[in-house]
């Protein structure tokens, strides 16, 4: 069905907890128990898009921008959003959106833009902070491997391009089982000492529930001891914008002309040219001007985004070349990400 095969694939790639606080990514309209008859992939849901899905007999629309942002007290067709909702419901069409969760995800929107430009050594420009937890538990020696494996499968232990990361320390645990318990080892009413392994690992905060479930399913104790510690570490694989390098430096004007052609931009606005060579490129699809200070701090030669406010040009014109290609133009290739995920 749509939920098990398509929505789950989208959310594995771009988990909903990665979306920004203002966002409304995820299921917008419809029931996901049906089998998909076809999927229409788009940047924005419009009436024309819903009409096309109806004409083609498709029952799924996947968009980058959410159709619904604000709350509605009634849906009676007052604007295009309400009309899209009504038409989708009438024709049993599911609408699903992956927005800032896809922007922030590894391999997401900004990575696709970087791919089109030809950047190498691409990394997150503004990594997320306070998204990670340290997890610690204590397991009898003989069961440590099984528990550790379950924790990794639940989402623990990923650091950069490494997985199954943990630190393990042998020690001794003590406990006294009370009346009414069924201890795995030791006797009721007697103090027991057990050789145990302290397992330390790391996880995204949104996987906490899955990790607890995995621990309780595999740990031999009735009451396993475990702790979560909030971390201040940045999560370098997740965040806003990216920065990378061109294979060879390019003249400013040549680079801008190539961007204009690659993204089919009618009018590419930019700050004045200074004659610098372009090699380090920072970018953010959509309205990304908030990342200009990060781009400057990264020593990028140019910052490319979809929307820039008037005064942002003046604030940074002496520090970096700023280029604005248009919101749609910057994110148009998001459809290719959707296609790769669900095909």
Task: Give residue ranges: language-model regions.
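Active-site catalytic microenvironments in core metabolic enzymes, especially phosphate/sugar-handling
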Residues: 3-343
């Amino acid at each position: 069905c749509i939920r098990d095969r398509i929505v789950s694939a989208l959310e594995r790639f771009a988990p909903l907890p990665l979306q920004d606080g203002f966002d409304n990514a995820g299921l917008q309209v419809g029931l996901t128990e049906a089998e998909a008859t076809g999927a229409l992939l788009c940047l924005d849901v419009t009436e024309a898009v819903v009409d096309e899905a109806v004409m083609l007999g498709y029952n799924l629309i996947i968009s980058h921008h959410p159709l619904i942002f604000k709350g509605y007290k009634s849906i009676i067709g007052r604007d295009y959003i309400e009309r899209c909702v009504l038409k989708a419901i009438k024709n049993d069409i599911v609408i699903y959106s992956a927005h800032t969760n896809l922007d922030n995800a590894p391999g997401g929107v900004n990575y696709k833009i970087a791919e089109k430009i030809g950047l190498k050594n691409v990394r997150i420009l503004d990594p997320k902070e306070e998204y990670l937890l340290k997890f610690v538990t204590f397991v009898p020696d003989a069961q440590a491997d099984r528990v550790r494996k379950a924790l990794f499968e639940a989402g623990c232990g990923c650091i950069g391009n490494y997985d199954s990361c943990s630190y393990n320390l042998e020690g001794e645990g003590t406990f006294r089982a009370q009346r009414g318990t069924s201890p795995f080892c030791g006797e009721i009413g007697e103090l027991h000492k057990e050789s145990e392994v302290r397992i330390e690992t790391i996880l995204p905060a949104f996987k906490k529930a899955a990790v607890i479930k995995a621990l309780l399913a595999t740990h031999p104790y009735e009451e396993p001891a475990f702790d979560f510690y909030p971390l201040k570490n940045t999560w370098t694989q997740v965040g806003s914008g990216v920065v990378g390098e061109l294979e060879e430096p390019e003249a400013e004007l040549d680079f801008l002309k190539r961007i204009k052609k690659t993204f089919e931009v009618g009018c590419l606005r930019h700050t004045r040219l200074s004659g610098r060579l372009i090699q380090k490129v920072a970018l953010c699809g959509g309205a990304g001007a908030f990342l200009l200070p990060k781009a400057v701090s990264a020593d990028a030669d140019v910052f490319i985004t979809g929307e820039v406010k008037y005064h942002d040009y003046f604030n940074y014109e002496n520090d970096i070349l700023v280029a604005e290609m248009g919101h749609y133009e910057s994110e148009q290739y998001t459809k290719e990400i959707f296609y790769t995920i669900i095909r």
